[in-house]
Amino acid sequence: MRRNLSFWIIVLAILVGLAACRNDDVVLYPDETPTPDGYTNTSSYRGLYVLCEGNMGSNKATLDYLDMTTGRYSRNIYPSRNPGKVMELGDVGNDIKVYGSRLWMVINQSNRVEVASAASAVSLGSVDIPNARFLAFDGKYAYVSSYVGPVNGPSVLGEVYRVDTLTLRVDARCTVGFQPEEMAIVDGRLYVANSGGYSAMQGGCLLYTSPSPRDGLLS
């Protein structure tokens, strides 16, 4: 009887030990770094947003904010500014830009672009774009480069999506090269840097098209 009891005590101890060693997901709570001693604001800007990528597959992209007037740094502000949304911003923050009064964030592996108020970081909506990468703006439009295909899938030709900044709707798209990255709009032309795909057989290149629908190149 004692031998059986000792056996089950050992088994229970092993199970408790295994449970204690399990790697639980880390919850990222908002926190702040206080104003440094002797801080003096020498910038003309009110603040600076920082989009933290987070580990791929962990759904831990976060948005931080540096208040330039006080020097206070606030981490992971998005959940508290948007209590009605899921706690995490998404998976893999890849690009962030302020255009007009809006804050645009590319959340790569969540396949979307999150749009918020630049003044408050309160969400205004989102745009679904597969494997989105980078942003560029011109007039009333946002341009988003996209790998299109999944990370672990075969390489496919990428695309550039044009988004109406007022309605947050995709109204045009254009096929470009493999794995398009950053873009520039110069003299009415949209230049797209294509990294060339995951295969060494697919060389990188620079393409240009017209951001204007009247030329029929972005359709």
Each predicted region: which residue ranges?
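Bacterial Sec-dependent N-terminal signal peptides
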Residues: 2-8, 13-48
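Short coil/turn segments that connect the beta-strands within blades of beta-propeller domains
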Residues: 45-46, 101, 140, 188
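Short, solvent-exposed loop/turn segments at conserved positions within beta-propeller repeat blades
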Residues: 56-59, 106-109, 151-157, 199-206
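Short loop/turn segments that connect beta-strands within beta-propeller blades
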Residues: 69, 117-120, 164-167
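A short beta-strand motif characteristic of beta-propeller blades
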Residues: 74-87, 122-127, 169-174, 214
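Beta-rich, blade/repeat-based domains predominating
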Residues: 86-99, 130-138, 177-187
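Single conserved hydrophobic/aromatic residue that forms the stacking wall/gate
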Residues: 208-219
